[in-house]
Amino acid sequence: MKFYDDVLNSNLSFEVANKLMKNKKQFATRPCWDGFHFYDKNGKYCILLKNGKVDNYTLDDVYDKEKNDWIIVTPTKRAIKLINNFIK
């Protein structure tokens, strides 16, 4: 199940996507992924996985940082419910 609806920006480097997540509280992913990456209310790097689980990661754990196909997305209503405790 895909946890995002709309793509707001595309073809971004991880560096740009990460800055948007961290500074603008946006959500990033890659076109081939169903979940997305975000920063929680405490500034921890998190990923909403395709199984609906949220895991904390470090930037060293992130795959495909060298790719330039990162996208900024809007979460689905279901995704917002799953991450609500992490962002509010």
Where do the model's predicted regions map?
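Structural boundary micro-motifs
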Residues: 1-88
